[in-house]
Amino acid sequence: MLNVRYKSVLISVLLLAITTEVWSMGLFDSLKVCLFSEVNGVVTNKGKPVAGVEVIQTAQINNGKLYTYTTMTDEQGRFHFDALFSHSINKVVPVQPRVPQNILFRYQGREYRGWKTSKHNYDEGGEINSLTARETSKDLKPIVLKCDLSDESRIKEQEFGSNIIGICEFQ
C-alpha cells in the first residue's frame, strides 16, 4: 500500500516538474490567441463627449469561455481596452476560428450596441487589418472607434473580416 502511494506522489511531482518546465520554456505561447485586439474609442451624443458611460466588452472563444471586461468613459468620453489574449488548443487544430465579439454601452438606463461581429482568426489586429499586415506585424493598427449614442445601429461591411453591427464607426 505504501509503495502505491509512493509511486502516486512521485508521478505527481514529476508531472508538476515537467509542466512547470514546459511552461517556462514558452511552449504554451504557441497556443496564444488574440480574442479581441486593442480598442481605443470615444462615446459622444450628438457629437458631444459623454462621461460616465459604462462600456462592456465581451469575447467568447469557439462557444467556450466568455470573457467580459468593463470600463467607464472619462470626461472626454474616451475608453480603452487592452488586447485580450488567451491560450487555445484550437490554434493548432484545423478548425475555422469563431470568436464572437461585442461592445455594449450602458447610459442613463439605456443600452446601446456599439460593436457586434465574429472574428475568424486568432491574429492581433485580425478584425480590421489585412493578412499581409498581420503576418508581418507591419502597419498593424489598433481598433479606433467613434460611437455616437444618437446614431442608429447599422451594418458596416468590411474589406477584411466579418461585417460589424452597431453605432460605432472606425476612425
State each model region's role.
Residues 2, 22-33, 91-171:
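Feature of secretome-associated and extracellular-like proteins
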Residues 11-12, 22:
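Cleavable N-terminal signal peptides
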Residues 48-59:
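Short, ordered, surface-exposed loop/turn motifs in non-cytosolic proteins
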Residues 67-87:
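Glycine-centered loop-to-beta-strand initiation motif
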